[in-house]
Amino acid sequence: TGAITPVAKVNPVNIGGVVVSNATLHNEEEIIRKDIRIGDVVKIERAGDVIPHVLSVDLKKRVENYKKFVFPKKCPSCGSKIIKDYNKNTKKFDAVQRCSSEGYKCEKIAIEKIKHFVSKDALNIDGLGKKVVEKFWEKKLIRFPQDIFKLDYNKIENLEGWGSQSTSNLNYSINKSKDIS
């Protein structure tokens, strides 16, 4: 989607048996509303027992010179302008800011699109999960969804963690995905 989601880097803390070192800040409006500043002591919870997010700031522990977070104007991945979509129904701009890059020009957007393309919600290709997509991207084996159907299996077989059997299994899964019923 190209959404730019700010994340708080926090000292590791155990929440419900899980060590948390990152917490979502949701969007710029939430940061402003909660007056979250760089260096603040914050209270974190795991929303729905899953995603850690900043609940509040301990203002008693705030140091006077803590700086306000300045939301970037350009995508940290590709440098394109960051925009807010206008919602015609509400007649307001959405809270979520997005990279304005189109197609597959932004690396982060391209990788996420490919991950979705091969996911259980789309082609459901066994053996081609998120980490594999990232590895294939890093090795320049894929840049677009259609590249999945033109993979160089000789190069894949020579990658660390891959061999003839895993490569053969991937080839089978990709060919099987062509027969969508």
PLM features: residue spans?
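RNA/tRNA-interacting regions in translation and RNA-turnover enzymes
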Residues: 1-181
